């Protein structure tokens, strides 16, 4: 049983270029920047997309973040082949093929091209800045 006291709040991304990264979400996916501030010596940008907040922050003094492994295809799945968060996903309420064509024209890369998922709906993965992978799934 799901605990109704919990509500999803945000995904937190550490970025080498937080302002460029935030702008990518705005230009490629139509996100909006809700807040741009500095906390603990690093920029923090709150990006809103699909009812979710993506908090993108820069390097804090003394931090040396390790790079994320790129997502890669295997026989019948894809993975970053590392422990931890692999990707996050959005349901797209529209023609996913047309959206993929638009994103491709803007230069977005697709580590996993458009295909039918296990549930029969179309899906793909796009490469976002900072080694982040985003799954886009067509609504059922």
Question: What is the predicted function of each stretch?
Answer:
Residues 1-4, 90, 100-140:
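Vicinal oxygen chelate
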Residues 3, 45-46, 77-80:
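Short secondary-structure boundary/capping segments
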Residues 1-20, 85-88, 140:
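N-terminal beta-strand motif that seeds the catalytic metal site of vicinal oxygen chelate
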Residues 13-63:
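Core segments of cupin and vicinal oxygen chelate
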Residues 9, 42-43, 86, 122:
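Residue-level marker for the onset of beta-strands and adjacent loop->beta junctions
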Residues 60-77:
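Short, flexible, mixed-charge acidic loops at enzyme active sites
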Residues 20-22, 95-99:
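Short, conserved charged micro-motifs
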């Amino acid at each position: 049983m799901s605990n109704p006291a919990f509500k999803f709040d945000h995904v937190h991304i550490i970025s080498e270029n937080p302002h460029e990264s935030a702008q990518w979400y705005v230009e490629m996916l139509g996100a909006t920047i809700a807040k741009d501030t500095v906390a603990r010596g690093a920029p923090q940008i709150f990006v809103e997309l699909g009812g979710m907040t993506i908090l993108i922050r820069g390097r804090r003094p003394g931090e040396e973040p390790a790079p994320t492994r790129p997502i890669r295809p295997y026989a019948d799945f894809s993975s970053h082949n590392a422990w931890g968060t692999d990707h996050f996903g959005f349901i797209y309420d529209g023609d996913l093929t047309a959206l993929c064509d638009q994103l491709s024209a803007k230069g977005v890369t697709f580590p996993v091209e458009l295909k039918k998922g296990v549930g029969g709906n179309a899906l793909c993965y796009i490469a976002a800045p900072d080694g982040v992978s985003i799954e886009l799934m067509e609504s059922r």
